[in-house]
Amino acid sequence: MFQFEITSNCSNTDARTGIFHTPNGQVNTPRFMPVGTLGTVKGISSKQLTSTGSEMILSNTFHLHLQPGEKLVKESGGIHKFMNWPKPILTDSGGYQVFSLAKLNNISDKGVEFKNPRDGSHVFLSPEKVMQIQMDLGSDVAMAFDHCPPHTANENDIEDSLLRTHSWLQKCVETHQKSNQALFGIIQGGKYPRLREYSAKFTSSFDLPGIAVGGVSVGEAVEEIHSVINYIPKFLPINKPRYLMGIGSLREISLAVAKGFDIFDCVLPTRLGRHGTAFFNDQRLNLRNARFKNDFSPIDKTCKCETCKSYSRAYLHHLIRNDEILGLTLISLHNIAHLIRFTNAISNAIKDNCFTIDFAPWKTASIAHHTW
């Protein structure tokens, strides 16, 4: 039911193209996943999201558990029907909330007790509970519960969190009983090569349908991000989809693809969109700036997204300056489409054996006959 098929390899790098087959369709890799934390990519309908070329989205177990609750989602027919998204969905386990809500939680080997950020009530999540929630949600891919420590933690503390993550993974594997849902394990270990290698080998030993690298892009220096991207792939199974969590910048995606990663997610395109910032090649345009007031060109003349086909920078500037919700939606749509387009261009370059680690498809010399 779940299969990862490698369709081409790059002779210049370790990049590859592939197809991840799921019960709700296939995901062509390399692929960027938009983030729909609460069962929605903020401000964007499922139909609009389809127009960007998105093939798989991410939702969050922790937040859906708090509201509206996994039982209600299950009663509706599952997460796909609930949000009217017929394509693959991956649910994050809530491990990131262990990190982001650190001041509101108490961690033990049994699980995490949170103070509900909505109403202050106590919520306990164990590995077993997290698996049950994701099975009830009915996502295509469920992530194992992990402990993501802050990047400032010392080596001993990160090793403790790593051992806890491994213990939780064993419990997740024992609990997960859904044949039409793939379970991915998560590698932790911070900036320490010894811990990353140990975690990669331990997680790979379970022979799960896919494997993820977590604890990246959580506030650390970009050099540390690149170090993990460069170091860890040699310890990962070749025949599994490799998911690098929390990465959404073009430079890091290009580097990660060159090292053999396949799937990425990040809130960046929609977060920037909600603040009026649009992607343009490898730049960011702040459409609030007065210089766009009389600019009647689209964000990107070469982009085929619904925003660029229909609206000017001047109109988007007007919407943003007046706090119109439509402006946030249109810019977010473009930003998602831009990242999907970028990974599509990478895929074409890999197939034509002209992909490089500093891939920049908007530069004619980089893409030969390819269009951008």
UniProtKB/Swiss-Prot annotation:
Keyword DNA damage: no
Gene3D superfamilies from the UniProt entry: Queuine tRNA-ribosyltransferase-like
Cofactor binding note from Swiss-Prot or TrEMBL: Binds 1 zinc ion per subunit.
Record-linked Pfam families: TGT (PF01702)
GO biological process annotation, one example: tRNA-guanine transglycosylation
Positions that bind Zn(2+): C303, C305, C308, H334
Catalysis performed (reactions): 7-aminomethyl-7-carbaguanine + guanosine(34) in tRNA = 7-aminomethyl-7-carbaguanosine(34) in tRNA + guanine
E.C. number: 2.4.2.29
SUPFAM superfamilies given in the database record: tRNA-guanine transglycosylase
Residue spans crossing the bilayer: none
GO molecular function annotation: metal ion binding; tRNA-guanosine(34) queuine transglycosylase activity
Residues involved in substrate binding: D92, S93, G94, G95, Y96, D146, Q188, G215
Keywords: Glycosyltransferase, Metal-binding, Queuosine biosynthesis, Transferase, tRNA processing, Zinc
Necessary cofactors: Zn(2+)
Positions of region (RNA binding): 246-252, 270-274
Active site: D92 (proton acceptor), D265 (nucleophile)
Any single Gene Ontology cellular-component annotation: cytosol
Recorded metabolic or biological pathway in which this protein acts: tRNA modification; tRNA-queuosine biosynthesis
Family: Belongs to the queuine tRNA-ribosyltransferase family.
Known role: Catalyzes the base-exchange of a guanine (G) residue with the queuine precursor 7-aminomethyl-7-deazaguanine (PreQ1) at position 34 (anticodon wobble position) in tRNAs with GU(N) anticodons (tRNA-Asp, -Asn, -His and -Tyr). Catalysis occurs through a double-displacement mechanism. The nucleophile active site attacks the C1' of nucleotide 34 to detach the guanine base from the RNA, forming a covalent enzyme-RNA intermediate. The proton acceptor active site deprotonates the incoming PreQ1, allowing a nucleophilic attack on the C1' of the ribose to form the product.
Assembly and binders: Homodimer. Within each dimer, one monomer is responsible for RNA recognition and catalysis, while the other monomer binds to the replacement base PreQ1.
Protein name from the UniProt record: Queuine tRNA-ribosyltransferase
